Amino acid sequence: MKFFIFTCLLAVALAKNTMEHVSSSEESIISQETYKQEKNMAINPSKENLCSTFCKEVVRNANEEEYSIGSSSEESAEVATEEVKITVDDKHYQKALNEINQFYQKFPQYLQYLYQGPIVLNPWDQVKRNAVPITPTLNREQLSTSEENSKKTVDMESTEVFTKKTKLTEEEKNRLNFLKKISQRYQKFALPQYLKTVYQHQKAMKPWIQPKTKVIPYVRYL
């Protein structure tokens, strides 16, 4: 009985060894075959592998071209937007320059207005300028006719004054003498002239403050 068990164990052990040897030999054979196939593929590639690699390269190049086209279109769009922004900024800048030019064109008028203002408020600071009359050019005939006409008018006025003087009565002479005396008295009394000059000075300094006064005539009865 013991011998039978011992023989069975030996048979099992031998069988395991043979199985392991066979499996290891099969694995080595498979690995050698795969290595040979890979080497053959590397040396002599097949048509299918060539097509697959070529197609992959074509697809990759197409994708790169599409990406480059898309990036270029985006860049062109950005450049267009920047140009539009620049043109809008230029328009605003030109408007500002036009407004500044208009202001400087109107500025001399403003200075002229300011210069005229103090002249109105301070009339005594005005510079006395000699007015040069513009003499028109006349012919000799026109000058002779104008001289004759002036002489005739002077003669007529002198004759009219002489006739008026001859027609004056004694009452009118007395009135004239009385008026002359009154005028001489007012000329000696200088206070009204001073008041008149002061009022004119205030009126020139403050032309907007002009009180409305009612003039009451003063009549002196004799």
Swiss-Prot record:
Transmembrane regions listed in the UniProt entry: none
Signal sequence extent: 1-15
Record-linked InterPro entries: Alpha-s2_casein (IPR011175), Casein (IPR001588), Casein_CS (IPR031305)
BP-aspect Gene Ontology terms: defense response to bacterium; response to 11-deoxycorticosterone; response to dehydroepiandrosterone; response to estradiol; response to growth hormone; response to progesterone
Modified residues (Phosphoserine): S23, S24, S25, S28, S46, S71, S72, S73, S76, S144, S146, S150, S158
Name of the protein: Alpha-S2-casein
Tissue occurrence: Mammary gland specific. Secreted in milk.
One Pfam family recorded for the sequence: Casein
One of the record's GO cellular component terms: extracellular space
Classification lineage: Eukaryota, Metazoa, Chordata, Craniata, Vertebrata
Function: Important role in the capacity of milk to transport calcium phosphate. Casocidin-I inhibits the growth of E.coli and S.carnosus.
Presence of keyword DNA-binding: no
Sequence repeats: 76-140, 158-222
Keywords, sorted A to Z: Antibiotic, Antimicrobial, Milk protein, Phosphoprotein, Repeat, Secreted, Signal
Family stated for the protein in its record: Belongs to the alpha-casein family.
GO MF annotation list: protein homodimerization activity; zymogen binding
Localisation per UniProt entry: Secreted
